[in-house]
UniProtKB/Swiss-Prot annotation:
Protein family (similarity comment): Belongs to the RimP family.
Name of the protein this chain belongs to: Ribosome maturation factor RimP
Domain of life: Bacteria
Main location: cytoplasm
GO biological process: ribosomal small subunit assembly; translation
Region (Disordered): 177-204
Keyword Cytoplasm applies: yes
Compositional bias per record (Acidic residues), positions renumbered to this chain: 181-198
Localization of this protein: Cytoplasm
Record's keyword terms, sorted: Cytoplasm, Ribosome biogenesis
Role, per record: Required for maturation of 30S ribosomal subunits.
Gene3D superfamilies in the record: Ribosome maturation factor RimP, C-terminal domain, RimP-like superfamily, N-terminal
A GO cellular component annotation in the UniProt record: cytosol
Amino acid sequence: MSDLVAKTAIDRRLADIVTPVIEGMGFELVRLRLMSGKTRTLQIMADRPDGGIVVDECADISTAVSAVLDVEDPIEDNYTLEVSSPGIDRPLTRLKDFDAWAGYEARIETAELIDGRRRFKGELAGTEGDEVLITIEDGKEGFVTIGLKFDWLSDAKLILTDELIAEMLRQKKASGNFDESQFDEIQETEGEEADEAETPITRH
């Protein structure tokens, strides 16, 4: 089954390289994107299996991933590595995410039109087989729960609500690493300007 963790061929190749490193440290890869631009940016989102990753842990992942990428050398051009938490309104990239966040609001987009639409907004209702269940507003029946095959999805993300913020703060506190000043910060490793403590990732 496909997922939304890594979409393109190069993203999937990079994910194959960094996933064992991230999982070996006790974390999970949530999403990976190699973004184009004057200087390419490799964006990695990671989290604890039970949520609550903090900035220092993102820094540790950045250092470990940089070392592996330095050896594998999969990116030809100069690039910047960014390792971050998924944030409060996190992307939903794996089928299990829709079970984990059942009861919370989300926006889902599909690659093709489904009954004349591609965008769906509503409350997640878990999964059934390979389908994502979401309760959406229906003009005729009030609310209806529909199933969307996971392979149909092109994007999915939680919607920022008071309930979601409360849950994320609960996870942070439960992890024992709660520091409001560090909430959702990004650890960046700049190619040629990387500190000696971090493996340089500039490529030519």
